[in-house]
UniProtKB/Swiss-Prot annotation:
Cytoplasmic topological domain: 28-221
Regions of this protein lying in the Lumenal compartment: 1-4
Subunit structure: Homotrimer.
Annotated stretches, region: C-terminal hydrophobic region: 174-221
InterPro entries: ERG2_sigma1_rcpt-like
Lineage: Eukaryota, Metazoa, Chordata, Craniata, Vertebrata
Subcellular localization: Nucleus inner membrane; Nucleus outer membrane; Nucleus envelope; Cytoplasmic vesicle
Record's protein name: Sigma non-opioid intracellular receptor 1
Comment text on domains: The C-terminal helices form a flat, hydrophobic surface that is probably tightly associated with the cytosolic surface of the endoplasmic reticulum membrane.
Membrane-protein topology: Single-pass membrane protein
């Protein structure tokens, strides 16, 4: 019996290792809709403007360049995010299993843990300040409007945003792997299940839009 349990454990670990390698290969070889430089450049062009004006212009530009990829106005919603001890708000524009684009920020001073992801995440600041303290360092660095901060795969940092900080965020990697961190505080701390519902709903809508657009491009519709 003990031998059988041990064999099952070995097979499970081996299966997981194979799945991880296959996923890494897929992420490394697939084509993507967006890229970090494009999003950073677009956000930087509008940094320094009133952030609501900047948001509107950025959404318009993204819809022109990527038709069918950005959620329609009726599905755009600002949703609270509690994670790693900090509190912010996001407005999801695009999401798939491997990419997302969103607007993010906070109306109050807030700080906490960045999370550690199987995804690369970049933020370009439109207004306010972003202070980052990297793991293994004894000093923090502060970023200003127009700056882009890149959070590498597997990296962990301390983050701090001043009130009125707003930015454009792009993530690339295995996006479902980020949801545990993004939703843990909501489930186990704030127990704000309405926010949880909003988050899952908008991500689901984004996945449906991306699937529909992809199938349309392949000629299914």
């Amino acid at each position: 019996m003990a031998l059988w349990r041990g064999l099952r454990a070995v097979l499970a670990v081996a299966g997981l290792a194979v799945a991880v390698q296959l996923l890494r290969g897929w992420l490394g070889s697939k084509s993507y809709v967006f890229n970090r430089e494009e999003i950073a450049r677009l956000a930087k062009e509008h940094s320094g403007l009133d952030y609501e004006v900047a948001f509107s212009k950025i959404i318009t530009e993204l819809r022109k360049k990527h038709p069918g990829r950005i959620l329609p106005d009726e599905d755009l919603q600002w949703v609270f995010v509690n994670a790693g001890g900090w509190m912010g708000s996001m407005c999801l524009l695009h999401a798939s299993l491997t990419e997302y684009v969103l607007l993010f920020g906070t109306a109050v001073d807030t700080s906490g843990h960045s999370g550690r992801y199987w995804a690369e995440i970049s933020d370009t600041i439109l207004s306010g300040t972003f202070r980052q303290w990297k793991e293994g360092s004894t000093k923090s660095e502060i970023f200003y409007p127009g700056d882009t901060i890149v959070h590498e795969v597997g990296e962990a940092t301390s983050v701090q945003w001043s009130a009125g900080t707003w930015m454009v965020e792009y993530g690339r990697g295995f996006i479902p792997s980020t949801l545990g961190f993004a939703l843990a505080d909501t489930i186990f701390s704030t127990q704000d299940f309405l926010t949880l519902f909003y988050t899952v709903k908008v991500y689901g809508k984004a996945l449906l839009l991306e699937t529909s657009t992809h199938l349309s491009e392949l000629g299914f519709f």
